[in-house]
Amino acid sequence: MPGSEDLRKGKDQMHSHRKRTMFTKKQLEDLNILFNENPYPNPSLQKEMASKIDIHPTVLQVWFKNHRAKLKKAKCKHIHQKQETPQPPIPEGGVSTSVGLRNADTLPRLPNAAHPIGLVYTGHRVPSFQLILYPNLKVPANDFIGHRIVHFGCCRDPNIYCLYPILESQVCAPSFHSGSPACSSNQSRER
């Protein structure tokens, strides 16, 4: 039937599949360099970059979109794997978990603008650690004893936290300050 052959050609033209783009090693290197410089290039920059590495601007746009999604997926998978790591069991006769504020006289010397908010987690006989939030301290001013914790993209928390070893004898009356921002796994998954 001559009519059915024409119908089939029209159907093929409507649903033609685009062939997969194969990038050369040099193009991939260039794309990764460009992505590291700017993961969200504007349309004029996309055209310029595409002409430099000899690909169509739409192909470049799709590669950037896919690469951002790939990195986001890998980041979420990494965070999810960290959350699934088993916690060490509390030794027999261990001290029950308590949360409280650290004595102010045991804090390291701080800049005048910093007011620490600390939580103590003691669940073992060995020394535990205290996480202290410095809400007004954006850039470390002094060398503190302990470890600085700065968030890099896992949440929108611009604060700096310091982790200090603490002994149970330094724990005050139990209290909890819920006003300190924290990076939750829900926030990480939403972004």
Curated annotation (Swiss-Prot):
Q: Does the record's keyword annotation contain Ligase?
A: no
Which Pfam families does the record match to this protein? Homeodomain
Q: Which UniProt keywords apply?
A: DNA-binding, Homeobox, Nucleus, Repressor, Transcription, Transcription regulation
Residue ranges of the annotated DNA-binding region, renumbered to this chain: 16-75
Which segments carry the region annotation Disordered?
1-20
- RNA-binding: is it a keyword of this entry? no
Any GO BP: regulation of transcription by RNA polymerase II
The protein's superkingdom reads Eukaryota
Tell me where in or outside the cell this protein is found: Nucleus
Q: What InterPro entries has UniProt attached to this entry?
A: HD, Homeobox_CS, Homeodomain-like_sf
Q: Where is the composition biased (Basic and acidic residues)?
A: 1-15
Q: Which PROSITE patterns match?
A: HOMEOBOX_1, HOMEOBOX_2
Q: Name one GO molecular function term.
A: RNA polymerase II cis-regulatory region sequence-specific DNA binding
What's a single GO CC term here?
Answer: nucleus
Q: Which family does it belong to?
A: Belongs to the paired homeobox family.
Described by its record, this protein's role is as follows:
Transcription factor that acts as a repressor.
What PANTHER family does this protein's entry cite?
A: DIVERGENT PAIRED-RELATED HOMEOBOX, HOMEOBOX PROTEIN
Protein name, UniProt field: Divergent paired-related homeobox
User: Whose protein is this, by species?
Assistant: Homo sapiens (Human)
